[in-house]
Every structure is written in structure tokens, then in C-alpha cells.
Amino acid sequence: MNFKIDKTDGNARACTLQTAHSTIQTPIFMPVGTLGAVKSLDAIDLKEILDAKIILANTYHLYLRPTSKVVREFGGLHGFSKFDRSFLTDSGGFQAFSLSKISKPDENGIKFKSHIDGSMHYFTPKSVLDTQYDLSSDIMMILDDLVALPATKERIDLSIKRTINWAKIACEYHKSNKQKSVGIDQNIFGIIQGGTDYNARKLCAEALCEMEFDGLAIGGLSVGESNEEMYDTVEALMPFIDKNRPRYLMGVGTPEDLVQNVERGVDMFDCVMPTRNARNGTLFTSFGKINIKSAAFIKDDNKIDPECDCYTCSNFSRGYLNHLYKARELTFFRLASLHNLHYYLNLVKQMREAIMQGKFKEFKREFYAKRGMI
């Protein structure tokens, strides 16, 4: 991976990273394609309509179904899905933690029960990389020990001990495999844990920065803490994360979360929010969210967002989308998802432009003013 910082504005950064499949300009939002597909969209939608440069897929789900071995037979995720730009794959640790009724982390990995058929499985730092080698993702995430917040100091200390040990194993395993021509075009990111405990986060960050990771992620946030705790944790952590590697905040978040964390120096984001909200009738606009289910939109001939030029806004009215949603017409899910993802991708594009011009503070002020939040 080639990575360079193009411009900074305060702590906000505009960077460029190059993988084997695409050039990615940051700040970047990654649409979530858990099963190798962003719900209701296909590769043409992602490339030609949204111009997405990178999407996220999930190791846990693809490991269970159709299995990573099947995906490998198609040439990895790129051949399987026909999305020929970059993929980032999560390690699956979060899903093993959150979806399994029986999830038991120990010193060597995580034992969990499949949410599909109840079968038992075991993830280790090496096995999740083996699965991701099969998937041929451009960026692979290591296995980490996630803790729901709030948590005791003892549990957080155990989490970072495991996470650091697993990171060492994963880093050395990937380095060894690349010497055998395995995963030579794949990059590996470490994950910093520690809850909202400053000392734990600092310890974990410093340990992982000593390792040969291509990028560093902040995990274990947006799992029960307040927004203020999230922002404070990210801000306190940034001085300890190597500035010459991409910084990825996992599973975050709202448009406001993106703006706040870009301001603090984060480069990469992912979240199911734009597509999940779209399917439930909540659409993002420059002036805040609207609920397209509302009777107020039945005869509304305006587009979703007066400032939006996405495919949906360029062709269809609020009234039409209101009708599609109430009729449970499947077309609604695609049109709403296209709009919400365009909104997110355009938001990070606007932030990049503001950083490049040295006007991030002005951008942030206008962003909140439009929402009536100043």
C-alpha cells in the first residue's frame, strides 16, 4: 500500500492511499457489503452510480456462508461480486462477539456458535487471516478482543493484553506468508482497543505502532459509550497513532460523527447506518434527516434533498418514494440506499475539498448551521 498525506488543516487530513485495485482519497466512507454485496445494490450501482472506491465485507459471515473456500474458487471477492475496486474485510471478531449466543474468548482466540445452524467454530489470529487470504481483500483486519461498554478495568486490561498478543501473532504470520508469496497484494491493519480508558488506549496504540501494520484502526467505540466519550477518546488517542499510516474508526457513524472525527484526524469510516436507515425510510439531507413515510410527503413533488444531485434525487420525487415505501415496493430499497450512500460519499468528498483549501472550520460551521445546530 502506498500512502501519502496530501494536506492537513488543523488535525484534519486529506490523504491518498493506493491498493492493488483502486486509488482512495480520504477522508473516505466505506459502504458496508457484509455478505459481499451492499444490500439492494450491485457492482454497477457501486461503481457507475456511486463511484465507490472501496467497500467493506465481513469475514465472519462469508466464512460461514458460502465459506471462504467457495469465494476463493471465483477469484476472491472481486471475482465473486464483480466489484473490481478495493475491499476491506473485517476480521469477524465483532460478529462472533455480538451475534453468537455463545461467545467465549480465551488467550488464543474466540469460540463461538454459528447464528445460522448452531455449529461451533473457533477464530484465531492466524485463522482469520487464512480466511481473508481466500477472500483476497485489499485490506485485512486482525482479530481483536472487543469489550462492550461500560466495562470493568480488569476486563479492559485483559482485552488489550489479548489484542496486543494477537496483533503480534497476526503481524508475524502475515510477514511470513508474504515471503511465501501469499497475500502479497494484501494489507493488514491493527486494531486499537481499550474502551474509554486513556491509559489502556495509549498502551495498546503504542504497542501496535511498533508493529509492521499498513494501517491502524480504532475499535471498540460506538458500543455503548456517549458521543462525547467517543470524541474525547479519539482525540486523546491521536497523538499516539503513527501519522504516516491510515487511521480507521470502525463502525462509525452518523454524519455528525464523521465531521467530528475527521476534525480529530480520522481518515476512514464504515457504518451500516446509511443503508439500514434507507430501508427503514429515514433519508439523510443537507438539512438533517427526513422520514419519507410521513404523510407530509404524499403530494411532495420535490427531491429528497434540494442540494443533492444523486441518481435518486435527479429522477424521482419525495411523493414517489413515499408511495414506494408504503407499498413495500422493492425498488424503494435501491433508490433510498443510493441516495443515502451518495450523501455519505459526498459528505467526505466535501470535507476533503475543505481540507485541501484550508477551510475545514468554515465547512464545519456551515454543516451545523444548516441543521440548526449552531
From Swiss-Prot:
RNA binding as annotated region, ranges: 251-257, 275-279
Entry binding sites for substrate: D90, S91, G92, G93, F94, D144, Q193, G220
Catalysed transformations (reactions): 7-aminomethyl-7-carbaguanine + guanosine(34) in tRNA = 7-aminomethyl-7-carbaguanosine(34) in tRNA + guanine
Active site per database record: D90 (proton acceptor), D270 (nucleophile)
UniProt keyword terms in alphabetical order: Glycosyltransferase, Metal-binding, Queuosine biosynthesis, Transferase, tRNA processing, Zinc
Pathway linked to the protein: tRNA modification; tRNA-queuosine biosynthesis
EC numbers on record: 2.4.2.29
Keyword Oxidoreductase part of the UniProt annotation: no
Binding site residues for Zn(2+): C308, C310, C313, H339
GO molecular function, one term: metal ion binding
GO biological process, one term: tRNA-guanine transglycosylation
Keyword Glycosyltransferase belongs to the record: yes
Pfam families xrefs: TGT
Cofactor field: Zn(2+)
Cofactor note: Binds 1 zinc ion per subunit.
A GO cellular component annotation in the UniProt record: cytosol
Subunit note: Homodimer. Within each dimer, one monomer is responsible for RNA recognition and catalysis, while the other monomer binds to the replacement base PreQ1.
Family membership noted in the UniProt record: Belongs to the queuine tRNA-ribosyltransferase family.
Function: Catalyzes the base-exchange of a guanine (G) residue with the queuine precursor 7-aminomethyl-7-deazaguanine (PreQ1) at position 34 (anticodon wobble position) in tRNAs with GU(N) anticodons (tRNA-Asp, -Asn, -His and -Tyr). Catalysis occurs through a double-displacement mechanism. The nucleophile active site attacks the C1' of nucleotide 34 to detach the guanine base from the RNA, forming a covalent enzyme-RNA intermediate. The proton acceptor active site deprotonates the incoming PreQ1, allowing a nucleophilic attack on the C1' of the ribose to form the product.
Name of this chain's protein: Queuine tRNA-ribosyltransferase
UniProt organism field: Campylobacter fetus subsp. fetus (strain 82-40)
